[in-house]
């Protein structure tokens, strides 16, 4: 990303983050009251325990590994229901910021206004969409945690082939962390692997059209004197 685009993004990042918090709060406001998440598949309790089913070694195939094990461990230190609320809230914020990051990376905002417009639009779509609402109604909070990691997998996956040494190292570290977050459920792990393979295999970031035109203008200017 060019220095101009980077400055534009830095100027808009704070406002986009606040917007992500605002629309996530509007979407999850019922969870701010007392009580626990009890919606279809989403059942949270103050305390959970490590059982054979939570470890995936029970009589039936478990589709909630390792989320049940993680919550069982966390519930020994804090309220398990509160932990689920916090994770769900952060997941949607990460989804919005990840969507905004993808937009900035590929669209090259030239001004702070462009970066703000792109970021707000992408973040809104990343958080407030039919998929998220449906998963909330089904109680699939852990799948939404994986969903929040997918934009970051796509973003960091496209950056691991960067020419900069430190950029590659940072991208690999961020990609590994995002993959671990996506692996909170088996479905999320599969989606994370697919996203990583697709993003790493994609061509490099497109050329900044405005900078390309500027370079052409500077290059072609001396030729005008020969015409």
Which residues are covered by each model-predicted region?
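Short, basic, low-complexity termini and linkers enriched in Ser/Thr/Gly/Pro
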Residues: 204-221
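Membrane-interface segments at the starts/ends of alpha-helical transmembrane spans
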Residues: 76, 176-178, 220-222
């Amino acid at each position: 990303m060019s220095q101009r685009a980077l400055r534009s993004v830095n100027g808009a990042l704070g406002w986009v983050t606040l917007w992500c918090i605002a629309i996530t709060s509007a979407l999850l406001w019922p969870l701010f009251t007392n009580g626990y998440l009890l919606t279809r598949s989403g059942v949270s309790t103050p305390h959970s325990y490590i059982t054979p089913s939570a470890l995936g070694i029970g009589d039936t195939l478990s589709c909630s590994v390792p989320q049940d094990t993680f919550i069982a461990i966390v519930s020994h230190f804090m309220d398990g229901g509160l932990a689920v609320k916090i994770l769900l809230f952060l997941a949607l914020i990460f989804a919005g910021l990840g969507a905004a990051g993808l937009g900035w990376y590929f669209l090259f905002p030239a001004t702070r206004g462009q970066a703000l417009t792109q970021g707000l639009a992408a973040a809104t779509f990343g958080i407030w969409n039919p998929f998220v609402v449906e998963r909330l109604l089904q109680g699939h909070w852990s799948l939404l945690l994986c969903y929040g990691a997918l934009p970051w997998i796509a973003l960091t996956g496209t950056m691991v082939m960067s020419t900069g040494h430190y950029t590659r190292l940072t991208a690999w570290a961020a990609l590994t962390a995002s993959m671990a977050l996506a692996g909170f459920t088996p479905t999320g792990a599969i989606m994370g692997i697919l996203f990583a393979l697709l993003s790493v295999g994609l061509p490099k970031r497109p050329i900044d059209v405005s900078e390309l035109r500027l370079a052409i203008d500077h290059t072609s200017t001396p030729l005008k004197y020969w015409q």
